[in-house]
From Swiss-Prot:
GO MF assignments: sodium channel regulator activity; toxin activity
Protein name in UniProt: Mu-conotoxin-like SxIIIB
Pyrrolidone carboxylic acid PTM sites in chain numbering: 1
UniProt note: domains: The cysteine framework is III (CC-C-C-CC).
Keywords linked to the UniProt accession: Amidation, Disulfide bond, Ion channel impairing toxin, Neurotoxin, Pyrrolidone carboxylic acid, Secreted, Toxin, Voltage-gated sodium channel impairing toxin
GO cellular component, one term: extracellular region
Modified residues (Alanine amide): 23
Its job: Mu-conotoxins block voltage-gated sodium channels (Nav).
Cystine residue pairs: 3-16, 4-21, 11-22
Location(s) in or outside the cell: Secreted
Family named by the database record: Belongs to the conotoxin M superfamily.
Amino acid sequence: QKCCTGKKGSCSGRACKNLRCCA
């Protein structure tokens, strides 16, 4: 699943919390 949305890399979903794009 794609957790990164937009150029800012906003996070959607709890599992995406640990991804770098969500930082």
